[in-house]
Regions:
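N-terminal hydrophobic membrane-entry segments
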Residues: 1-197
Length: 197
C-alpha cells in the first residue's frame, strides 16, 4: 500500500468527525488542518496528539511520542501506521429537533386533552475533540449532524415533553393559548435542556 503524502479533509460542513481512510503514513506526511478543524492522531488505539489549524509534518520532532513507537532506519524518514481523525469545530446553528408524536396535554381551563407538538432548532459546537471522539463517536468513521440528532433523540424528546407539560401545568397555560407564551416557554425549555445537552 502506498504511503500517504498529504492528509486533509475538505468535505461537507455537516460532518462533525471524519476518519481519514488510509493509515499508511510517514514521517514526511503533510497534515493540513483547516481553520475550523482539529486533527487527532491515534496510534495503537490511543490518542497521540491533537493538531490545530495549519500545515504539520508528521515527524518525530513534532510528535515526540512517535520516537518511542516507530523505528527510524532510513535517516529519520520512516513509514508508520496511525489514524487521523478530523473534527469540525465550526459552530452549527441549524440542528433541527421535534417531537415525532404529539404530547397529550390536559387543558387546565377546560379539562380536555389537547395534542401539542414541539419543534425547533439548536446550535452545537465541539469544544473538546478528544472527549467527543472517545465518549460519543467511538470507531464510527463518519459522524455527522444527523448522527448526533439520532444519538440524543430519545433524551431530548423525553426532556422536551416533560418540560412542556410541566410548564403548562404550573403556569396554568391553556394549550389553545400557547402561542402567546412561545418566547417565555422557549427560554424555560432552553434552561432545562442545557444541562442535559
Amino acid at each position: 500500500m502506498a504511503i500517504v503524502e498529504v492528509v486533509k479533509y475538505d468535505g461537507n460542513p455537516d460532518v462533525l468527525v471524519w476518519k481519514y481512510p488510509s493509515q499508511e503514513l510517514g514521517t514526511w506526511t503533510q497534515l493540513i488542518v483547516n481553520e475550523s478543524q482539529e486533527a487527532v492522531l491515534y496510534k495503537g488505539g490511543k490518542i497521540f496528539d491533537v493538531f490545530q489549524s495549519g500545515r504539520h509534518t508528521l515527524e518525530t520532532a513534532n510528535i515526540p511520542l512517535l520516537n518511542k513507537v516507530i523505528n527510524l532506519p532510513f535517516g529519520g524518514r520512516s513509514p508508520f501506521t496511525a489514524e487521523v481523525w478530523f473534527v469540525n469545530k465550526l459552530y452549527s446553528l441549524d440542528v433541527k429537533w421535534g417531537t415525532p408524536t404529539p404530547i397529550q396535554i390536559q387543558d387546565p381551563k377546560y379539562g380536555v386533552f389537547v395534542p401539542v407538538r414541539a419543534n425547533g432548532r439548536f446550535g452545537i459546537q465541539i469544544e473538546d475533540s478528544e472527549k467527543f471522539l472517545i465518549k460519543l463517536v467511538g470507531s464510527v468513521s463518519v459522524f455527522d449532524r444527523q448522527s448526533l440528532v439520532k444519538h440524543f433523540r430519545g433524551l431530548y424528546i423525553t426532556k422536551a415533553k416533560d418540560t412542556i407539560s410541566s410548564y403548562v401545568v404550573h403556569k396554568q397555560v391553556s394549550p389553545l393559548e400557547i402561542n402567546a407564551y412561545l418566547d417565555e416557554m422557549s427560554i424555560f425549555l432552553k434552561e432545562k435542556m442545557e444541562p442535559v445537552m
